[in-house]
């Protein structure tokens, strides 16, 4: 199965500027949808807040040209065939929340034998990662738009993933917002059901109270085991590059904690049925 190639489009000199968008018209007709899942699934507390941000001309161009080839709207309507999505049967790592995509692109370039399915709702970041993938020839990156929970629950098969990365999720620091944090027992159970035995769950955060919550929750969960013999946090592995956001935090004296847990074999997870995350 061949890997799809991105189309290229060049504007000629003197080409007229795009017309103004009519009221109600999609922002990017061939790009990501504003709410791909719509109201087809139950309302629940979300760990993210979609926000409108300025999209540069380069990002808009990438969204229009490359989304039909390398983009995916999370609508929950079907079970994904990951080999078809990537054009090969290499291992797939899911990354939830990639910001502007620089670290994602760097990891994809360093490990061409692993496919990365990167999920975010931030339109400028989606466009920038698509641009980086084309610029650097990264055929192992696909960009997904929407709710990662719906993707995991409705669109991925049990044991489909060889890894899961959650780098610097929103810490929701106010106590009344802690319920919005992504790393919760219910999420970990869902994630465990979609990770193959031995797959790595890698989290990183610079918010220490959230790091402690992550460590406590992962340690208590029967689907995961800490790769650290001391049961604590891990040093940043060399394969995880420093992000722009992380550098800013380090400059302010923030402490960054990495957590690396492996998905334990099925037989070690008493009472769990594959495909039944809850």
Listing of model-derived features with the role each one plays in the protein:
Residues 212-278:
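Class I S-adenosyl-L-methionine
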Residues 183-197:
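A short glycine-rich, Lys/Arg-flanked "PGG" loop and its adjoining helix->strand segment in the class I
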Residues 2-94, 102-109, 130-159:
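S-adenosyl-L-methionine
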Residues 96, 119:
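Conserved beta-strand/loop positions that form the S-adenosyl-L-methionine
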Residues 197-205:
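Conserved beta-strand signature within the Rossmann-like core of class I S-adenosyl-L-methionine
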Residues 99:
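Conserved glycine-rich SAM-binding loop
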Residues 122:
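Conserved SAM/SAH-binding beta-strand->alpha-helix loop
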């Amino acid at each position: 199965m061949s890997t799809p190639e991105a189309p290229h489009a060049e504007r000629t000199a003197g080409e007229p500027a795009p017309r103004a968008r009519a009221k109600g018209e999609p922002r990017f007709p061939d790009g990501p949808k504003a709410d791909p899942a719509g109201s087809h699934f139950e309302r629940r507390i979300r760990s993210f807040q979609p926000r409108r941000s300025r999209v540069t001309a380069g990002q808009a161009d990438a969204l229009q040209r490359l989304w039909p080839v390398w983009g995916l709207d999370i609508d929950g309507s079907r079970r994904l065939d990951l080999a078809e999505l990537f054009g090969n049967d290499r291992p797939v790592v899911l990354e939830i929340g990639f910001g502007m995509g620089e670290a994602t692109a760097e990891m994809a370039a360093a490990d061409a034998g692993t496919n990365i399915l990167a999920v975010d709702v931030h339109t400028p970041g989606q466009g920038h990662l698509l641009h980086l993938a084309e610029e650097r020839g990264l055929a192992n990156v696909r960009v997904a738009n929407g709710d990662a929970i719906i993707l995991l629950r409705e669109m991925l098969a049990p044991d489909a993933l060889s890894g899961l990365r959650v780098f610097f999720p929103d810490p929701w620091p106010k106590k009344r917002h802690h319920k919005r944090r992504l790393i919760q027992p219910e999420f970990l159970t869902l994630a465990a059901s979609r990770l193959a035995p031995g797959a790595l769950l890698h989290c990183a955060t610079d918010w220490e109270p959230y790091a402690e919550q992550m460590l406590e929750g992962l340690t208590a969960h029967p689907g995961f085991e800490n790769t650290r013999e001391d049961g604590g946090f891990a040093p940043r592995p060399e394969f995880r590059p420093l992000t722009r956001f992380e550098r800013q935090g380090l400059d302010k004296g923030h402490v960054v904690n990495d957590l690396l847990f492996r998905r334990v074999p099925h037989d070690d997870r008493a009472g769990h049925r594959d495909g039944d995350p809850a």
